[in-house]
């Protein structure tokens, strides 16, 4: 350091005067270029505000990742650039040149060069880190657990940049005055050394960015990661929920970020953890052991993490490319001797522009779907059916909730990857009503298949008298028992099917309509007429068949086909604009029917084994809203619960405002408790509808034993509704 200071004090004159005459041809240091000064001042102010904003925003993040911390260090580089350019502007002010101006020129040039090297090296480091985490089966912890390592890497980059920038103080090269500030002497061989360092960083960044660009920005299908079925069953937490609430998996189209990721081997990958196609299972398991408390795939944190990788890739390429003209100009001037002051000034302004783009990274927290579909022409809805009507192979978790010619399906699926198209049942064609089947009915015990399929159909619902013949297209896959933490095995069976016996006229009328927050038109009430006035419903009509209250949200039939231990319940909730605070809106909810059908115990079942059944529940919900603004806050929550009343599995809510599914926590209640007031205060009905598989098993057993004498709780509820309807008509 003493050597640097001595050289800085004794050699300032030579460092500056060596090439002084070459820089005052058109714009001497004492002449002020008002246009350049004003433009530099504006860009410097923008860089100052942006760097402070991005630094504060990134440091205030609750779940900081390695990517966000590295970008935060970028903001520090931007502040360093602001300081150096501020000195440049001071040097441009017309005045006599005192001795300390030489010191300022050397200091500002050193800082300018140091932040440039640091920014470019960190860009390469960021892209390398993203490439490593996306193509290796290695888990990476959040920055909060590796803050020391991240800080060490950042300090190392800064130290290396400072060392390389300070070489002119040791006698190799010199800093000279320019019309816009100060820069290294381009006639020195030191410029070639800098260009080699930049070229290596640039080449590595471009080489790694090519596969990442396709993976993060231009892939037709976002990367996806299989979470273990048992992990999903335990539930998960989301931002805004207490730590003790468990862990929630959000299963939404946006939350699945890329096509080539594999199952994590039953772990909870971190927000930066993904597994590439070539990663062995052992590597994934080892990564899980290193990080048992990471962020689950599909959660909001995981989605933001993938968005951060997208924005970091774009910013890294932007910063390095904006420095390219300056480096090329320096090399050309060194090799050929050609010097163009306008080109040099323009190159300087581009490097200054590179310091103003860092705040764009903060957008990754909210705009998780960008830049796909916006900056890059990506296929935003990778779950829609191809226009040519061909079947699209689907794998892993799949979701689709749409209105297309009065027909829409929402699916949840979980399976291992199948390479054979004909063995994959997870495709969806909205234009026909063919059954989705699997052609491999019996698989070896080494193959694992766990599937949950939820269908939300907006086609006309069937009366209770016709429900028995619904499940006509059914195939069953025998699954392998998976070993749990207690080394006990549960056999899961999956029964898939759907309400597909609908008239063709259902699919030939009306244009395509999709649930989207961009749609400002209100639903045509005539489209919903079929959903009212059924035998087990309370009609919501006035005279003239007009709704008493405007209809909003969603109404239809929900069908669940699940392995043993799962059933489905559906309810509606009011959600805040941020999509995190969930408040039950009990006054706006009316459940008309929740009836389990197709509950058939296994014929080979014995009292000593766990009952293996396939439960199918139809739950119809009609929500009545008092105001039109509720359209932006209404969500549909499908809750899949286990037989245990103490364990709740993930729940999904569909937000019309956000146009996607997100996860939520509904608490530990395992049943609906409905209070039905009647005209007689003593005759009020309070019914508890079970929401567990075990309760449905008991109901099914009693129904087979007692035959006509037994009624489920939901049947009592329907009876109460009819009684209330008769009382209202009588009055």
UniProtKB/Swiss-Prot annotation:
Residue segments, region Disordered: 234-271, 475-526
Keywords of this entry: Cell membrane, Disulfide bond, G-protein coupled receptor, Glycoprotein, Membrane, Receptor, Transducer, Transmembrane, Transmembrane helix
CDD domains the record matches: 7tmA_GPR149
Subcellular location: Cell membrane
Cytoplasmic side: 57-69, 133-155, 211-310, 364-731
Intervals, Extracellular compartment: 1-35, 91-109, 177-189, 332-342
Name of the protein described by the UniProt record: Probable G-protein coupled receptor 149
Annotated source species: Homo sapiens
Gene coding for it: GPR149
């Amino acid at each position: 350091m003493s050597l640097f200071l001595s050289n800085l004090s004794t050699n300032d004159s030579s460092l500056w005067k060596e090439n002084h005459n070459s820089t005052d041809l058109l714009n001497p240091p004492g002449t002020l270029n008002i246009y350049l000064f004003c433009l530099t001042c504006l860009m410097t102010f923008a860089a100052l505000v942006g760097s402070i904003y991005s630094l504060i925003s990134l440091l205030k993040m609750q779940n900081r990742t390695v990517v966000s911390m590295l970008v935060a260090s970028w903001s520090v580089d931007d502040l360093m650039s602001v300081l150096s350019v501020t000195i440049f502007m001071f040097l441009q002010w017309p005045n006599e040149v005192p001795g300390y101006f030489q010191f300022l020129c050397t200091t500002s040039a050193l800082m300018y060069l140091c932040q440039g090297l640091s920014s470019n090296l960190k860009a390469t480091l960021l892209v390398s880190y993203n490439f490593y985490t996306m193509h290796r089966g290695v888990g990476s912890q959040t920055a909060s657990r590796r803050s020391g390592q991240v800080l060490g890497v950042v300090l190392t980059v800064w130290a290396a940049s400072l060392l390389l920038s300070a070489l002119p103080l040791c006698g190799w090269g010199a800093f000279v005055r320019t019309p816009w500030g100060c820069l290294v002497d381009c006639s020195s061989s030191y410029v070639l050394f800098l260009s080699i360092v930049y070229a290596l960083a640039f080449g590595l960044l471009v080489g790694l960015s090519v596969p990442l660009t396709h993976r993060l920005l231009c892939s037709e299908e976002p990367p996806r990661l299989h979470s273990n079925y048992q992990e999903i069953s335990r539930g998960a937490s989301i931002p805004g929920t207490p730590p003790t609430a468990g862990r929630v998996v959000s299963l939404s189209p946006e939350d699945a970020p890329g096509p080539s990721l594999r199952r994590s081997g039953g772990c909870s990958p971190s927000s930066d953890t993904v597994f590439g196609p070539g990663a062995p299972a052992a590597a994934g398991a080892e990564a899980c052991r290193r990080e048992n408390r990471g962020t689950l795939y599909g959660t909001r944190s995981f989605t933001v993490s993938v968005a951060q990788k997208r924005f970091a890739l774009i910013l890294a390429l932007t910063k390095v490319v904006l420095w390219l003209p300056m480096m090329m100009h320096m090399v050309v001037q060194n090799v050929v001797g050609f010097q163009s002051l306008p080109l040099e000034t323009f190159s300087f302004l581009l490097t200054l522009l590179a310091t103003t783009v860092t705040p764009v990274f903060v957008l990754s927290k909210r705009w998780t779907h960008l830049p796909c579909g916006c900056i890059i022409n990506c296929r935003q809805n990778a779950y829609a059916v191809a226009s040519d009507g061909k079947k699209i192979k689907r794998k892993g978790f799949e979701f689709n909730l749409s209105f297309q010619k009065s027909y829409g399906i929402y699916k949840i699926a979980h399976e291992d990857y199948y390479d054979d198209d004909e063995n994959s049942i997870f495709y969806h064609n909205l234009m026909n009503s063919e059954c989705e089947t699997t052609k491999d009915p019996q698989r070896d015990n080494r193959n694992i298949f766990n599937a949950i399929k939820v269908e939300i159909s907006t086609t006309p619902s069937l009366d209770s008298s016709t429900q028995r013949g619904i499940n006509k297209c059914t195939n069953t896959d025998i699954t392998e028992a998976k070993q749990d933490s207690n080394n006990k095995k549960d056999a899961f069976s999956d029964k898939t099917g759907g309400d597909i016996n609908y008239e063709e006229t259902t699919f030939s009328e009306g244009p395509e309509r999709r649930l989207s927050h961009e749609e400002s038109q209100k639903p045509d009430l005539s489209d919903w007429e079929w959903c009212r006035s059924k035998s087990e419903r309370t009609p919501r009509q006035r005279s003239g068949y007009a709704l008493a209250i405007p209809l909003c949200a969603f109404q239809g039939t929900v069908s669940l086909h699940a392995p043993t231990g799962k059933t489905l319940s559906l309810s509606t909730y009011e959600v805040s604009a941020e999509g995190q605070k969930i408040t039950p809106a009990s006054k706006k909810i009316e459940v008309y029917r929740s009836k389990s059908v197709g509950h058939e115990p296994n014929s080979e079942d014995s009292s000593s084994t766990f009952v293996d059944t396939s439960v199918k529940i139809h739950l119809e919900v009609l929500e009545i809203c008092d105001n039109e603004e509720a359209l932006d806050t209404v969500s549909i929550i499908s809750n899949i619960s286990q037989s245990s009343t103490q364990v709740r599995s993930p729940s999904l809510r569909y937000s019309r405002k956000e146009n996607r599914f997100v996860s939520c926590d509904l608490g530990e209640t395992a049943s609906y408790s409905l209070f039905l007031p009647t005209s007689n205060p003593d005759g009020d009905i309070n019914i508890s509808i079970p929401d567990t598989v075990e309760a449905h098993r008991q109901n099914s057993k009693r129904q087979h034993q007692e035959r006509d004498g037994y009624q489920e709780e939901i049947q009592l509820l329907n009876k109460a509704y009819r009684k209330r309807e008769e009382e209202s008509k009588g009055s």
